Amino acid sequence: FTGSFDTVYAGSDVVAVKLLLSQDTGGAHPNTAAVGVNVDPKTGRQLALDDALVLTGMTLEQVAAESLAQLKAKLGPDLISPQGADPKPENYGTFLVSASAVTFVLQSYQVAPYSSGMQEISFPRK
């Protein structure tokens, strides 16, 4: 395994860190997964999906519908697994909070081939 991290946002309300974890399984490329860690620095509590949705002012169904529309426009025929954007908590569990947005990260292969990379869909914070 290898790993790296990037501080996405360090504000008074949220500290967000993006972790990238890779494993070489002997294939053509490593398997990489993103993990979003979003913490309220005042309480130490890690934010959950419900918290992210509150920050956007949207429901999971609304986020999923807009995500699918953006993915169709961006990926076209490379959108091979649209069900990866269905309104299920497991599809939107990886997210990163910034000062102005909540960005949901869809893992490699979740909606598109590895060559298309991880997909990120951002929504303004309300």
Regions flagged by a language model, labelled:
Residues F1-K126:
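Compositionally biased intrinsically disordered regions enriched in Thr/Gly
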